Amino acid sequence: MAATIFSSFMVMLQLICVIIVVAYLLTRSKFFLEVLEGHSTIKTQIVLILIFGILSIYGTINGVEMLGAIVNVRDLGPMLAGLIGGPFVGLGAGLIGAAYRGTLGGITVVSCSLATVLAGLFGGLIWLWCKKKFCGIKVAVIFAILMEGLHCLLTLLIVRPFDQA
């Protein structure tokens, strides 16, 4: 049992590392410089939506079964999109991730899809609150923890029968 949990944890860590590497490479691109300088074009925003939307799909595809549930990092793409590019970028990436999650079906399809969209939207609202700038690692980590709590709460509120949530 402990070996299985450790193995699953390592797979999740690999997923997160891939997303971090992509985000790091993105920070070295002209798109990110436009965002930092505060004058990103609609083209730049669409590119960011697509990149972070694909990361959301990647996080879904590579989910790991743990204790009977699929654990994934789908919401991380839209969260980062919102925190870096604002509500339009976060919402766009969230809609891509949610649309893909919707194709998979299952008992948690509505709660998971809704949580993914909200992750991008709330990330964007935090970006606005921080005067259209990245808010820093501390705020991002707190946001991620709170967002995962909201995701769990949505699942408990929406999924029926309750004992399968």
Residue ranges of each PLM-predicted region?
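Hydrophobic transmembrane alpha-helices
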Residues: 1-79, 89-165
